[in-house]
A protein has these predicted regions:
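Long, low-complexity N-terminal extensions
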Residues: 1-210
């Protein structure tokens, strides 16, 4: 199968804020020079306290999201408690490392809250797992990092985090041809996973453009 036949995701980000995390993606999937889809899901709810963003092959990404979601649910049923972000990150890293010679063509961000606080982990195709205060993946990540390095600060409010996420992804969509077609975003705080509505994202975009 040639590169032009493969549907690939592109730009995602995650931010650790004072009261939780913000995760966001754009929605374009490309097949070589062709825009394959304009409403691609790259942000997955794994559990009430955990979410995953994906960049890379859509098929690999969707399968890994289903796999992790099932493992987390089984853990909760067996142990009667939520899986920690560190444990989920280690599990996902081990799965990916086991395929390092025939790797999944993805880069993942795993984020959420647990008893130890808020976390964002970046996971690569070889099984590397790195926590940080902010992370980005995909072809538009250089543009996102430019914005985040300049504007991110510790203890951002979730409102500030949502605005920064929209600003950073907008910068990527303006310059990276493989990124575009809108933004999907969630927050995870003490109330659990919450999807940010398209109307709220549009309002933030309007405010930033003013």
């Amino acid at each position: 199968m040639s590169e032009k036949d493969l549907k690939k995701g592109t730009t995602t980000l995650g931010l650790v804020c004072k009261d939780g995390i913000v995760m966001a993606t754009e929605m374009r999937a490309t097949m070589g020079n062709l825009i394959g889809h304009k409403t691609t899901q790259k942000l997955f709810r794994i559990s009430d306290n955990m979410a995953l963003t994906v960049a890379g092959l859509v098929g690999d990404a969707q399968m890994l999201a289903r796999w992790l979601s099932a493992e987390v649910k089984l853990y909760e049923l067996k142990h009667g408690t939520k899986m920690s972000l560190r444990a989920a990150s280690t599990l996902m890293a081990n799965i990916m490392n086991g395929r390092r010679y025939m790797p999944f063509w993805v880069q993942l961000l795993l984020g959420g809250n647990d008893s130890e606080g808020s976390h964002i982990y970046s996971l690569d195709a070889a099984g590397g797992s790195i926590p940080d205060q902010f992370q980005t993946t995909g072809s538009g990540s250089p543009f996102v990092y430019g914005v985040l390095e300049d504007r991110f600060k510790e203890n951002l409010s979730l409102t500030e985090g949502k605005k920064l996420g929209v600003r950073a992804l907008t910068a990527a969509m303006k310059r990276d041809s493989a990124s575009g077609d809108g933004i999907s975003m969630c927050v995870i705080d003490s109330n659990g996973f919450q999807k940010v509505s398209p109307k709220e994202i549009e309002k933030i975009e309007t405010t930033l453009a003013a």
